[in-house]
Design a protein with these regions (language model features):
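Short, charged helix-capping/linker segments at alpha-helix termini
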Residues: 62-71, 126
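Residue-level detector of well-ordered alpha-helical segments, enriched
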Residues: 69-74, 88, 130, 134
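Non-catalytic cell-wall polysaccharide-engagement segments
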Residues: 2-51, 99-110, 114, 118-223
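Active-site histidine-acidic residue metal-binding/catalytic motifs
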Residues: 58
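Glycine- and aromatic-rich loop/turn segments at beta-sheet edges
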Residues: 85-96
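Glycine-rich, acidic and aromatic/proline-enriched surface loops and short helix-turn segments
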Residues: 76-85, 140-143, 223
């Protein structure tokens, strides 16, 4: 009987330890800003095999830039930018002032991760914790983060649309992506892609955990 109990405990303990460790990381990774009371977890969905083959390299450079928790966001960006099939998979050449498709695959991922990290840092410095500002800025450039910082500090489609309208001088082009067709009949302003957040987020499942929920799960796990 005692041996059976030991075996049961030995089986359950690693699982409980993993739960405690996971949620402990969530809490420790909280932003210092007390207004940000949620811990987002990003999981990828419907990513193609061509994109997933780049995951090890994305993980490597995400880790180097301190953004490992955003690996699935970066993979979703690759899905939108190139489907994982172009050489410059993250289309990050232009963030270096280079012509499009100037970088090799590894150079593209290295620069894409570095650029994303710089945008994330810039947004946090401006008091913004909305990941969608970072995502849209990856497409528009850092000027969009400045624009949002002066207009509520939270991304919205209307802000993305108005930013593109101003930058394009109001010039519209046909855009037949299903998301655009559903939203406005199939057009966008001729500057970047005002639907970029929607395009990326269709490949993400974003869950929010409140501090209270995380703590409750940890307390329950520790009972055992």
């Amino acid at each position: 009987m005692r041996l059976k109990r030991i075996l049961i405990i030995g089986t359950i303990f690693p699982v409980l330890f993993s739960i405690v460790l996971f949620f402990g990381i969530l809490i420790s990774g909280e932003d210092d800003d007390s207004s940000n009371s949620y811990s987002p977890v990003y999981s990828g969905m419907n990513l193609s095999a061509d994109v997933l083959k780049h995951q090890p390299m994305v993980e490597k450079y995400a880790r180097e830039n301190g953004i490992s928790e955003y690996v699935n966001v970066l993979l979703a960006i690759i899905q939108v930018e190139s489907g994982g099939t172009a050489t410059d998979v993250m289309q990050s050449s232009e963030s270096l002032g280079l012509p499009p498709n100037s970088l090799s695959t590894e150079e593209s991922i290295k620069q894409g991760c570095k650029y994303f990290a710089s945008l994330l840092s810039s947004c946090k410095a401006k008091g913004m914790n909305d990941i969608n500002v970072v995502i849209q800025s990856y497409n528009y450039g850092g000027g969009y983060a400045d624009y949002v910082a002066k207009n509520g500090k939270k991304h919205s489609f209307n802000l993305a649309e108005n930013f593109a309208k101003n930058k394009s001088g109001g010039t519209k082009v046909t855009y037949t992506n299903p998301i655009a067709v559903s939203k406005n009949g199939g057009w966008r302003y001729n500057y970047g892609n005002m639907f970029y957040v929607e395009l990326v987020n269709q490949y993400l499942n974003i869950k929010q955990f409140s501090n209270e929920t995380v703590q409750a799960v940890m307390n329950e796990a520790l009972k055992y």
